[in-house]
UniProtKB/Swiss-Prot annotation:
Keyword DNA-binding: no
Keyword Transmembrane helix: yes
GO biological process, one term: mitochondrial electron transport, NADH to ubiquinone
GO cellular component, one term: mitochondrial inner membrane
Reactions accelerated catalytically: a ubiquinone + NADH + 5 H(+)(in) = a ubiquinol + NAD(+) + 4 H(+)(out)
EC number: 7.1.1.2
Function according to Swiss-Prot or TrEMBL: Core subunit of the mitochondrial membrane respiratory chain NADH dehydrogenase (Complex I) that is believed to belong to the minimal assembly required for catalysis. Complex I functions in the transfer of electrons from NADH to the respiratory chain. The immediate electron acceptor for the enzyme is believed to be ubiquinone.
Annotated protein name in UniProt: NADH-ubiquinone oxidoreductase chain 2
Native organism: Mareca americana (American wigeon)
TM ranges: 1-21, 25-45, 60-80, 95-115, 124-144, 149-169, 178-195, 200-219, 242-262, 274-294, 326-346
A GO molecular-function annotation: NADH dehydrogenase (ubiquinone) activity
Class of this enzyme: translocase
Length: 346
């Protein structure tokens, strides 16, 4: 790929995201989603490997179908009510169609099948964009229409996402697929609270973005695409691997790390809404995700690779991690004491 193309594509992603999150008209929001889709496809397929081309094709087909559903949903609503305003989604059929369309774009169960395959075929930094930035515009549309959505449908999809994200991640050895199922599981937590507290859903997404970005940047630094590569990287980057372990434990939601905050607040809010069974179910389902986070953390720090070397650490190490990785890792680990202030601001 032309080296000048990447900045143009990244700017296009920023433009598409900005158009979608700042628009009140359905056609403008749809335009932003399409700009995002067309900008990310070259980044997915830039290695020209058959798996990357396959991932780009799968991504294009699913996103095109989802965008068509978004447009059809908005047209159905406009036909029935005469409104093109995003916040005026009042027609019940339009609400169901939009929920399905956004679920496809986000990768919520039962529309999740494309997401792990696309992430597996993408470079690590493109996978980071797919897991974080590309989910922000569709999530914004859900937040803007949250008062019109069906709570029972979203709760069902959320619990299914938490269950399947944890269950399918158990037997994975590829780091990108593990993080794909992690993303599906976290989307379940966001979806279950979306109708009752949109601001808390947004806070959960922000914290998920910080933690996932730190993990992807660390994995990109040590070039770890599977568990065995994570296993052998300790001798070269011990500090980064130790930090990666803490960020993974935070992503799992263990106290006293940052990732515990959104789970704690969501369970508290669900209990206030008299949804104690749903809160208990999603809390129990998060234990499935905890297992593969612990396995990844265990491989990154506690075990050593089987080799004939009689020393624990190589005499040379890689360059120190970049400043963004250090900042994101610190935020991923240390934000829990600030949770009262963050919750008050939200």
């Amino acid at each position: 790929m032309n080296p000048h193309a990447t900045p143009v594509l990244v700017l296009s992603l920023a433009l598409g995201t900005t158009i979608t999150i700042s628009s009140n008209h359905w056609v403008l929001a749809w335009t932003g989603l399409e700009i995002n889709t067309l900008a990310i496809i070259p980044l997915i397929s830039k290695s020209h490997h058959p798996r990357a081309v396959e991932a780009a094709t799968k991504y294009f087909l699913t996103q095109a179908a989802a965008s068509a559903l978004v447009l059809f949903s908005s047209m159905t609503n406009a036909w029935a009510t005469g409104q093109w305003d995003i916040t005026q989604l009042n027609h019940p059929t339009s609400c169901l169609l939009l929920t399905a369309a956004i679920a496809i774009k986000l990768g919520l169960v039962p529309f999740h099948f494309w997401f792990p395959e696309v992430l597996q075929g993408s470079p690590l930094m493109t996978a980071l964009l797919l897991s974080t930035l590309m989910k922000f515009p569709p999530l914004t549309l859900l937040l803007m229409t949250s008062k019109s959505l069906n709570p029972a449908l979203l709760t069902t999809m959320a619990l299914a996402s938490a269950a399947l994200g944890g269950w399918m991640g158990l037997n994975q050895t590829q780091t990108r697929k593990i993080l794909a199922f992690s993303s599906i599981s976290h989307l379940g937590w966001i979806a279950i609270i979306l109708v009752y507290s949109p601001k808390l859903a947004l806070l959960t997404f922000y914290l998920y973005t910080i933690m996932t970005s730190a993990v992807f940047m660390a994995l990109n630094k040590i070039k770890a695409l599977n568990l065995s590569m994570v296993l052998t990287s300790w001798t070269k980057t011990p500090v980064l691997n130790a930090t990666l372990m803490l960020v993974l434990l935070s992503l799992a939601g263990l106290p006293p790390l940052t990732g515990f905050m959104p789970k704690w607040l969501i369970i508290q809010e669900l209990t206030k809404q008299e949804m104690t069974p749903a809160a208990m179910a999603i809390a129990m389902l998060s234990l499935l995700s905890l297992f593969f986070y612990l396995r990844l953390a265990y491989h990154s720090t506690i075990t050593l690779p089987p080799n004939s070397s009689n020393h624990m650490k190589q005499w040379y190490t890689s360059k120190p991690p970049s400043t963004p990785t250090a900042i994101l890792a610190s935020l991923s680990i240390l934000l829990l004491p600030l949770s009262p202030m963050i919750h008050a601001i939200v």
